Every structure is written in C-alpha cells, then in structure tokens.
C-alpha cells in the first residue's frame, strides 16, 4: 500500500519531468512573457488538481477522469475521456523520449542532439521500454521517491543559484514590454494551452488510488504536496531562465530568446535547463554542473517515458475490462501476464508520432488531449455535485457556489471554462493540430461503435467483464493465485485456490509442468505427457471457469521449484497453492520442489494437504526413476 510520500513521488516524477522540455516549447512562442504563461497555466493546474482530489477521494479506484465520467455520465463519455487520456500517454512517451535524446547529446555525442539522431534515439528508447514492460516491471517506490527528491532539490538549487548569479528585474521588465508584437497575440494565446504540457502526470495519483493507504487522507495530501512543489519551481525558474537568456530583438523587428531557438541555430529549445546552466558563471563547477544536469534530465525523462508506457498498459487493460476496446488489445501475455498487444500497439503509435521530429506539434497535440480530459473531469465533478450530493466526500474542492439549490465547486467551474477556452484556442489557431486530434477522436469513436455493436452492446451502458465475487468472505483474499501442477489434476488444490482468489477473471493461473528427462532434448516430442498436462489445464478451467488461465511449461527433473518462484515473481502473484508432497521411499519429486519454494518464496505459500491418489504416487516413482538417469 502506498502512502503520502510514494504517491507524491510518483506524481512529481511525471509532473517534474516536463519542465525539462516545456520551458523551451513555451519560450519559443511566449518569449518574455513565458513566466506569465506558466502562472496562468499554474492556475489551471490548481483548479484541475482540486477537482481530481475531490473526485478521486470519492471514488478511490484507478481510472482518473475516465472513471469520473462513468460515474457522472455514461460509458460512452467514459470511453471518450479514456481515449483522450490514451492520446496523452502516447504523446508523453514520444515527447519524453525525444527530449531525453537531446539532453544525452548535450554532453555526449552531438548526433543525438539533431535530426535524425534524436529520432533514432527516441524510437530505440521507446522500443526498449515497450519490451521491458511486456516482460513486466514493478514500480520501484523507493526509487521513485529518491528520484523525485533529487529532481526537486536540484531544480530548487538551480533557482537559488540563479537568484544570486543571473536574476535581473530590469532585463525581465524589458522582456515583457513587447506584447502584441513579440510575442504576437496569436503566439501568446497558443503558448497558454501549450504550457499545460508542463503538468503532465496529474492523472498519476488518481490511477494509483486503488493502491493508496487510507486513500481519503493520502490522496488529497499527496496532491497538495505536488501543487506546492510544482508552484515552487514553475513560478520561479522561468524568471531565472529569461534573465540568463533574455529576449533580443534584431534590426528587422524580430525578437527571440535562445531559450526557444533550435540547437541548429545556436539555441537551447531542445535542452532549456542545460542552457540555463551553461549561461551561469559557476566557475570551476561549470563543467560538472552541466554534466550533472544532463544526466539527471536523461534519467528523469527516461523514467517519464517508462511511466507513459506503464500508463498505456494500465489504461489498455482498464478499457478492455469495461468493454471499451477489443479484447485482443488487453490480452495478457501467456507467460509475463501483461497486456502485451496494447503495449506494443500504442508504443508503436508513439514512435510514429515521434518520426516528424516536431516537438512543438507534439506539445500542442498533448494539450489537445489534456484539455479534453481535464474538461471532462471538471464537468463530471460539477454533475456529481448535482446528482450525487450525499455521497461522502473526504475532500471537497475549496469554495462554494450555490446555483438553483445546488452546491457547485467554483474552482471546477473556473477550470472547465479555462480548459474549454484553451481547447478552442488550439483548435482554431492551429489547423494541423485540430485535424490530427480530431482524427484520433473519430478513429476511437468508430472503433468503439463497431466493437460495441459486434458485442451486442449499446453505447452508453456499463458492461464490465464478469468478475465473480469471492467464494467466501471470511477467507484471506489475494489479487492473483499461482497453481503449479506436475502430478496430475487435484481438485482440492484448485478449490483452495478458488477460495483465495479475489479477482476471478484471470485471478488464478495454472502452470502445468511437463518434465523432460535429461536423456532427451528439452524440445523433444512427448505427446502423452503434453496431452496429460493440457488435460490439467482444461479440468482447471472447467472447475474455475473463466477466472482461470494457464500454460504448459517444459522443465528438467528438479527444476520445478525454481520455475515456480520465477513464475510467481513474473506474474506478481500474491499466493502460491501447492499440494503437500508425499514421501515415497524416503524421497519425493515435490519434496525438493516445496523446499525450494518455501526457501525463496516471493509471496505467501498455501499447502493443500489432501493425499494424492495411488495412480499419482505410481507416476511419481516413474518420474523419479527417469530423472535419476544421467
């Protein structure tokens, strides 16, 4: 279970990473008004964060704005919101990988700092992380906390150093005196929604709500911490940046800041934080500081890319469970138990989005999806205040607004006005972004309609994949149960596993071992043994129903214990159910197996003590004799 610190670290790891690229993207358009843009987008972030805090505390389940839309409206709007979220995740993956390449190139090989090196680096990174997530990774909470603290303290140190070394109010005042010409009103208005890319990751805490400890307290508390940390950096660092890299105007009237100029033209748009450090007089610490910032940026951005892939994995599975997309996309890998098809498909889309190498376009596309999902979150909270006024709210968004007898959240009202206005600005002033974003939404809605019709479902009702309730409510319950089988089917073991499984859909995974003697190649055909192992899986599915999944595993004699431990770790099992071994002539195949499992267990081990039938004992003797062969 996750507490305040873990939730804060996970969220700030995502939100804090975006400053490494958002600063350059915004400065390219807003020029000297970049700090003002971050203050305005910070207000939107505050409104949105309070909405997420109230709604997530009400419904402490994974899902974020998609869950809020389901509770407030219906399944169609839940899908619409989830599909916008998916766009956010895809773009987060692409843009984080893209800028990781540029920071890496800043202190290593220049090839990665320019096209096509940045694209090659980004695509390779996405492909690697997609494969890693197919293999299955766990969120390392302690690592997240350490990275978040290091990141925040480093950014804070940069702000403090900048205040003493480069901060110049006179320069900043001059930077802000060109509104209407530098930046133009159009660029300034576009920069505001683009600035929301600085707040990627607000969904993180909401999606981890199901893992939170005392969610009524920890979720609002962690969101408040994120807001404080974000404002401490985002409301100060842009002033330092514009002092170090001020706006300069040429004889033709055009104005620029190196903060928003591409690297090819001598600027720092692709690595703005590194640019700030390079333009500080740090003396003997200069070189070390530049390397430190670049390495930290690459580390944080790689972690953000991985967080995006993890988000795709979770969202794909959630949408599949709620019948919002074809089952094939949420299909779990037979060995690694991850939605591998969804991970590979949406990671491939992130690679496609990266190919043009247009960072500003990626940022605006992110803003397109984010403004939609944030708007739906605000609208959902407003509607829930009307339709569900009596639902307990451990946290309430500040302020009160009485309208026709209803107590509405004023910050959510301001938030939806701001996000919808920003969405309108993006769509009206950038046709290519509007076309790409609308195409994504239309494709998603078409897939949704076709899929639901083929399933015989309407578009608005919630139809979740059947997950039966626990068999008994007084037994210990586990999220997943591993049942390894080597000596024939045992219905008593399966019955015990059924009682322990809390999630009945794929909540029980059966591994049926086929033991291959040392004298034969591991891939040698063993039709009888394979048929018997397959029969075990079929009997398990008959007894356990759709809750059961499984696969065959070829092993050598004596390897069962190790494979059980590895399988339990890979699938993140919370319990292993084994039959109690019977001693035969002083030894037993499963005697060694059980000793290995108990010695190296990654989770709780439950032993079923029902004696095996005589046929099983006879088969064990035969296996032992075969295993003894050299």
Regions picked out by a protein language model, each given a short descriptive name:
Residues 12-23, 61, 81-101, 194-212, ...:
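Membrane-helix boundary/coupling elements in multi-pass transport proteins
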Residues 21-121, 156, 229, 236:
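Extracellular loop-to-transmembrane helix junctions
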Residues 113, 145-218, 223-290:
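Helix-loop-helix junctions that connect adjacent transmembrane segments
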Residues 117-168, 223-227, 363-377, 431-445:
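Membrane-interface loop-to-helix entry segments
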Residues 328-338, 375-427:
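C-terminal membrane-solvent junction of multi-pass transporters and transport-like membrane proteins
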Residues 360, 364-365, 369-370, 402-459:
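A generic transmembrane alpha-helix motif of multi-pass inner-membrane proteins
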Residues 473-527, 548-552, 600, 607-610, ...:
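Small/aliphatic-rich secondary-structure junction motif
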Residues 578-599, 614-615:
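Glycine-rich, Arg-bearing micro-motifs that act as flexible, cationic patches
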């Amino acid at each position: 279970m996750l507490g305040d610190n873990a939730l804060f670290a996970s969220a700030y790891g995502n939100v804090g990473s975006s400053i490494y690229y958002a600063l350059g993207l915004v400065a390219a358009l807003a020029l000297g008004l970049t700090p003002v843009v971050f203050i305005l987008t910070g207000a939107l972030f505050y409104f949105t964060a309070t909405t997420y805090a109230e709604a997530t505390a009400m419904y402490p389940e994974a899902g974020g704005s998609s869950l809020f839309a389901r509770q407030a409206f219906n399944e169609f709007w839940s899908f619409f919101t989830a599909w916008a979220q998916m766009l956010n995740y895809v773009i987060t993956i692409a843009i984080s990988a893209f800028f990781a390449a540029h920071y890496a190139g800043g202190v290593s090989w220049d090839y990665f700092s320019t096209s096509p090196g940045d694209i090659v680096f980004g695509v390779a990174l996405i492909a690697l992380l997609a494969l890693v997530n197919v293999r299955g990774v766990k969120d390392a909470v302690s690592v997240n906390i350490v990275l978040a603290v290091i990141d925040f303290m480093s950014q804070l140190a940069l702000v403090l150093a900048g205040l003493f070394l480069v901060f110049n109010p006179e320069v900043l005042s001059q930077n802000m005196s060109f509104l209407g010409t530098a930046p133009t009103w159009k660029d300034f208005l576009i920069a505001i929604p683009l600035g929301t890319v600085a707040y990627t990751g607000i969904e993180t805490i909401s999606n981890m709500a199901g893992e939170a400890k005392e969610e009524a307290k920890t979720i609002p508390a962690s969101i408040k911490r994120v807001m404080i940390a974000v404002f401490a950096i985002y409301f100060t660092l842009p002033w330092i940046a514009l002092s170090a890299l001020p706006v300069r105007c040429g004889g033709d009237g055009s104005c620029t800041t190196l903060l928003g100029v591409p690297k090819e033209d001598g600027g720092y748009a692709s690595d703005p934080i590194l640019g700030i450090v390079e333009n500080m007089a740090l003396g003997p610490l200069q070189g070390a500081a530049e390397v430190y910032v670049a390495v930290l940026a690459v580390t944080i951005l790689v972690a953000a890319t991985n967080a995006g892939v993890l988000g795709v994995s979770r969202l794909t599975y959630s949408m599949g469970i709620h019948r919002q997309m074809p089952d094939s996309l949420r299909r779990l890998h037979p060995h690694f138990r991850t939605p591998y098809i969804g991970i590979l498909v949406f990671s491939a889309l992130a690679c496609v989005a990266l190919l043009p190498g247009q960072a500003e376009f990626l940022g605006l596309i992110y803003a397109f999806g984010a403004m939609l999902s944030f708007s739906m979150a605000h609208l959902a909270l407003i509607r829930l205040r009307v339709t569900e006024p009596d639902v307990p709210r451990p946290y309430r968004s500040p302020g009160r607004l009485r309208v026709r007898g209803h107590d509405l959240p004023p910050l959510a009202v301001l938030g939806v006005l701001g996000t919808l206005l920003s969405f309108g600005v993006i769509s009206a002033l950038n046709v290519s972004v509007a076309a790409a974003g609308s195409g994504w939404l239309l494709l998603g809605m078409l897939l949704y309609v076709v899929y639901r019709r083929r399933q015989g479902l309407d578009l608005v009702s919630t139809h979740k994949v059947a997950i039966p309730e626990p068999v008994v409510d007084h037994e210990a319950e586990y999220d997943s149960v591993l049942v390894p089988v080597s000596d024939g089917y045992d219905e008593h073991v399966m019955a015990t596993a059924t009682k322990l499984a809390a999630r009945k859909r794929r909540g029980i995974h059966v591994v049926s071992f086929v033991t291959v003697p040392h004298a034969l190649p591991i891939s040698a055909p063993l039709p009888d043994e394979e048929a018997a192992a397959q029969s075990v899986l079929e009997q398990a599915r008959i007894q356990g129903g759709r809750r059961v999944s499984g696969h065959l595993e070829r092993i050598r004699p004596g390897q069962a214990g190790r494979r059980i431990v590895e399988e339990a770790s890979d699938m993140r099992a919370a319990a292993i159910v084994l039959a109690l071994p019977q001693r035969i002539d002083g030894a037993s195949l499963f005697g060694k197996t059980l000793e290995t499992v108990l010695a190296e267990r990654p989770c709780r081990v439950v032993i079923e003590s029902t004696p095996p039938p005589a046929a099983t004992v006879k088969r064990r003797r035969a296996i032992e004799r075969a295993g003894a062969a050299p």
